Every structure is written in structure tokens, then in C-alpha cells.
Amino acid sequence: LTILEPESTPFVSMANKATASGTFFEVQVDDLSTANFDGVNEGEDVTAFDNKAANRARIGNYIQSFRRTFAVSNIAELVDTAGVANEFSASEAKAVRELKRDFEAAVCSAQDRQADSGAGAPYKTRGMFKWLGVGGQPSDVPTFAQNVANDTTGTQTEATFNSVLQELYEANGMPGGQLTLIAGPQLKKEISDFARQAGGAGFAFSVTQPAESKKITLTVNLYEGDFGTVAIVPSVFLNRTSGSSTIDGDAGLLIDPEYVAIHTLQAESNSELENQGGGRRGFCSLIAGLACHMPKAHGFFN
């Protein structure tokens, strides 16, 4: 039995991990006032004071419950199936793999947070693209914390890519200097084209490589620019719509891993339910949400 599907979950893997203690969790954001060097007159008394917490704000997100079910009839478990040693265990393992993909796609989506309001309207966690303002800025994110580094013009060139890095640096100073770009397949290919120069009917490369290996490497997995270093990881779970297999190949999340976290209320678990006569059945579940500590720490392409 062979199952060959995309399963890499780079965003969840690199994000910080935290514990949620309720259905809604919050972080605080603040800013610094603009640099001022007007000076102070000699002998001038201090008569005015600033409230340094005036701009402080709380931004938060809901958890979301994820679940995958599985069941195996009595006969299906008893008969020999080619390539499957245990039908119930195989079904359970498949559900776990699907659950991981569900969560990755949710936190990399543009869905907004939602409180549970009854049947058909469950808790939903805000996805990273929505945190960064795709489809409109979230109402709880103050202006000073909103994302400003992005490009939605289409095909990426080195100039447009560097412009986003410059915007990010100007917004937050790039304190870590180490970014990760989770890139759709088309965006990943466009970045690899940065080393190419247009000429004639095709592209010309200018590379110097040792000939002993008898191979040519034409890929970009680490980009070092004027405004930081970017590790580039491909993904097919960016900006997805729930239940759709459509891949947004041009999408990309430019993430500073220090400023995102997964808050888990219930860790991934598997449960077997009572066999009511028809066969063994069960489910795997996860309850967690995405915290973005500061939207302007990140960028996106779309």
C-alpha cells in the first residue's frame, strides 16, 4: 500500500510551542515613540510626563478543534488485505497524517478567528495570512503593529523581493536577522531564477562551481541580502481554502520564527470508541491555535 501525498508542515514545525489555558489567548504589543532630539533648555523643569503604556494593546486568537475519524467493519478487519497488516492501525495512522495537514493548512490560511456560536459555527483560529492583513486588517491589531512588508504584484524579481526585506527592516529593524520564507512552488521557482540573466530566447547563468562533482546546482535555498538571511522552504499548504485542493503557488509567508507560536489546549491524541457491533471505530483530535506576537515582524507574498 503506497500513499504519496505532500505531508511537510514547515510552519508548525518551526513555530514556538506554548500552552493555551482557555479558548481565547492573548499577547500584548507596544511601540516606541519617534526619535526626538529637540533638546532641553538649561534650567527647564520637568512639567509634563508621558504615559508609556498608552499605546499598549492586546491581540488574541481562538483555539480550533481539529478531528479526523476512522472506522473499520468487522469483516474488513478479519480478511487479509494486500499491503495492510492491520486495517484498524492503518486507518488510524492515515487519520493522524491527515490531521497534521489540516492544522498546517489552517494556520497558513487567511481565515479569520471565530467564536463558537452553535451548530455550524465552531471556534476557528486566525490564520497567518489574515494576521498579516490579507482580506483586510484584523480589527484588534493596532496600526503600529500591522504588517507593512508584502508584495502582491505577481512574479517576483530580486528587486521586488529585496523591497519586501527593506520594508521589513524599516518597520522593525530585523532584530533576529534570520527569516524563513515558506514559499509556494511557483514562488520558490521564481526565487531560484534570481541567479539567471535574461538574454536571447532563454536564460544565461553566471556561476562558478568545481567540476569534480559533475553536477550543476541551480537552486536557491538560502538567500543572504542587505537586510538579513532568508531560509527558503517550499510548501503546498499556503493560503488554502478549507476542503479545496487548489495550490496557491505564488503565495509565501516571510516569518521571523521568534514571533509566532502554536498554543495547544489539547495535544494530538487518538481515541478508540465502543464497538457497537459494526466494527472498531475511533478518532484523532487536536485543539490548538496560532499566536502572532507582532504582525509587523513578518511579511508575505501573494
Regions found by a protein language model. Name each.
Residues 1-302:
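Flexible, glycine/threonine- and acidic-rich loop/arm segments that mediate assembly and lattice contacts
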